[in-house]
């Protein structure tokens, strides 16, 4: 049966670190488990903060960035499957900032967030 032939893969995935397991199950198996989404975003946010420790980020900007971390995960998943990500104008609207402010302040953070998820994908696989 198919369950038997795939059991070694399931065991391998389930033995991974929590954020790797959560990413693979959410991204590739289509699981919408809330706990996986939380594990992915918490891990990515911690990674983002670790990378950003050398630069001071204003509190209001920080709050807006928190709201974007899950969108970055969704954008990377879409890209991995040949879909399109978000346009910067859309992201500016979602973040509640002007496109000029997005370009000046948020673009580099958005790129860093997406890079974190691309790295997570590579490491998990």
How should each PLM-predicted stretch be described?
Residues 1-52, 56-61, 80-125:
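N-terminal interaction/assembly modules
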């Amino acid at each position: 049966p198919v369950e038997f032939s795939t059991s070694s893969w399931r065991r391998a995935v389930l033995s991974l670190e929590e954020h790797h397991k959560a990413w693979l199950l959410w991204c590739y198996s289509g699981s919408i488990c809330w706990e996986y989404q939380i594990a992915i975003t918490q891990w990515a946010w911690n990674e983002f903060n670790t990378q950003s420790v050398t630069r001071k980020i204003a509190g209001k900007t920080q709050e807006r960035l928190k709201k974007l971390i899950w969108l970055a995960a969704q954008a990377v998943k879409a890209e991995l499957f040949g879909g399109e990500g978000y346009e910067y104008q859309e992201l500016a609207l979602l973040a509640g900032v002007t496109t000029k402010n997005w370009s000046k302040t948020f673009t580099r953070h958005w790129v860093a967030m997406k890079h974190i998820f691309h790295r997570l994908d590579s490491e998990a696989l």
